[in-house]
Swiss-Prot record:
One of its GO terms (biological process) is tRNA methylation. Residues 214-375 form the TrmE-type G domain. Gene3D superfamilies: P-loop containing nucleotide triphosphate hydrolases, Probable tRNA modification gtpase trme, domain 1, tRNA modification GTPase MnmE domain 2. The lineage of its organism: Bacteria, Pseudomonadati, Pseudomonadota, Gammaproteobacteria, Pasteurellales. K(+) binds at residues 224, 243, 245, 248. Its cofactor is K(+). It is found in: Cytoplasm. This is tRNA modification GTPase MnmE. The gene is mnmE. Keywords: Cytoplasm, GTP-binding, Hydrolase, Magnesium, Metal-binding, Nucleotide-binding, Potassium, tRNA processing. It comes from Actinobacillus succinogenes (strain ATCC 55618 / DSM 22257 / CCUG 43843 / 130Z). Its EC number is 3.6.-.-. The keyword Acetylation does not apply.
Length: 452
């Protein structure tokens, strides 16, 4: 028999309204015990909430939702009373006196909604993301995920893969039917379409992950280029020590900031040069480790340094060591000394921003550039939010699609193509929860609020 669970749905502490939520087969029994009568589904009732001996604990609104027409798909009772924590604790204690009712685990209401097919896994995760959203756009994107936008894109991919699997496996299982998919250009065409479609979803998911988790921006460059001054300017405080001595920063410095609500992880690193000092060499090694994991790199150049007036050499030396997939923005700092005008230009495929970290002139240009790099939009449009596990699943699916394409075009191996397509379907289905381990479900829902 399914269990009946209860939890406080509003935050712990004082408030105007406090809500307790009950879900499960005993929800109607709890209603009779607390308000003294059966409740008509989907009608608000203003009633006293009573203790076991009949004394009134509080009075408020009682709502009953009958299975399957509820958030969890089970019978649900909501008691909306006053928001004092003592009153809510007394009412919670009263509900737990009903035999068979227990406290809910974190995220258990959403888990029940998932298990009862009221939500898929990506939609359930979007509930927590909507609650935790730190900007208007993150909230709108989480809502789109909750409404199924991400899931619909994934399901379209799954449908395409299933179609291919059906075609390929039929040809393998029934060779007498003369379905020669190896010589059929349509199958390769469909496979290419799915690969392109998946890449578009991966790109959107990457942007959605940045909205949720923040973009990691690493400030890199030669010593004394003004990296620490730029960190301080973006952070709005003296987070890093700044001196005229080259090599002042020996270790990695991190600051978490928001630009119009968009989360940003700014990382200041040691100046890049051939160092003889052991401590500085360690700092430079750590700097490159951070650079290789960045979502974007700000390459700092000292515009007052004669060498930086020909930045191609500095840039080429740096880019030669940088992974090609990491975007780079070039910052020409110290315009107050060089006399260059603050502004943004496009040069040789790079965005170049001229500013002075010391005087803060041009910093707003950099802030706007970072916002746009993160996908900031002022309107109501926006994509979906994505989590790291979603990106991992999409990456694995993309890998097996590429392998399947090789099996088809180079080796004409039908059985191996079918197996790669099976793996693609499995990884995509992990996102929505069609094929998901119990351990993964436990980890996901345990991070939710109690009462959600």
């Amino acid at each position: 028999m399914k269990e009946t669970i209860v939890a406080q749905a509003t935050p712990i502490g004082r408030g105007g309204v406090g809500i307790l939520r009950v879900s499960g087969p005993l929800a109607a029994d709890v209603a009779k015990a607390v308000v003294g009568k059966a409740l008509k589904p989907r009608f608000a009732n203003y009633l006293p909430f009573k203790d076991e001996d009949g004394t009134t604990l509080d009075q408020g609104i009682a709502l009953f939702f009958q299975s399957p027409n509820s958030f969890t798909g089970e019978d649900i009772l909501e008691l909306q009373g006053h928001g004092g924590q003592v009153v809510l604790d007394l009412l919670l204690k009263r509900i737990l006196q009903v035999n068979g009712v227990r406290l809910a685990r974190p995220g258990e209401f959403s888990e029940q909604a998932f298990l009862n097919d009221k939500l898929d896994l990506a939609q359930a995760e979007a509930i927590a993301d909507l609650i935790d959203a730190s900007s208007e756009q993150a909230a709108r994107s989480a809502l789109k995920s909750l409404q199924g936008e991400f899931s619909n894109k994934v399901n379209q991919l799954v449908d395409g893969v299933i179609y291919l699997r059906t075609y390929v496996e039929a040809a393998i299982d029934f060779p007498d039917e003369e379905i020669d998919f190896l010589a059929d250009g349509k199958i390769e065409g469909h496979l290419n379409d799915i690969i392109a479609q998946l890449e578009r979803v991966r790109s959107e998911a990457k942007q959605g992950s940045i909205l949720r988790e923040g973009m990691k921006v690493v400030i890199a460059g030669r010593p004394n280029a003004g990296k620490s001054s730029l960190l301080n300017a973006l952070a709005g405080r003296e987070a890093a020590i700044v001196t005229d001595i080259a090599g002042t920063t020996r270790d990695v410095l991190r600051e978490h900031i928001h630009i119009d609500g968009m989360p940003l992880h700014i990382i200041d690193t040691a100046g890049l040069r051939d160092a003889t000092d052991e401590v500085e060499r360690i700092g430079i090694t750590r700097a490159w480790n951070e650079i290789e994991q960045a979502d974007r790199v700000l390459l700092m150049l000292d515009s007052s340094d004669p060498d930086s007036r020909q930045p191609e050499k500095v840039r080429s030396e740096f880019l030669a060591k940088l992974p090609s997939h990491i975007p780079v923005t070039i910052i020409r700092n110290k315009t107050d000394l060089s006399g260059e005008n603050e502004g943004v230009t496009q040069e040789n495929g790079f965005t170049v921003i001229r500013l002075s970290a010391q005087t803060r002139q041009g910093i707003d240009l950099l802030r706007e550039h970072l916002k746009q790099s993160m996908g900031y939009q002022t309107g109501t449009e926006g994509g979906f939010l994505a989590r790291r596990r979603h990106l991992d699943a999409l990456e694995k699916a993309a890998y097996h699609l590429r392998q399947g394409h090789i099996q088809l075009t180079e080796f004409r191996a039908g059985e191996l193509l079918a197996e790669e397509l099976r793996m693609v379907q499995s990884h995509l289905s992990e996102i929505t929860g069609q094929f998901t381990s119990d351990d993964l479900l436990s980890n996901i829902f345990s991070s939710f609020c109690i009462g959600k």
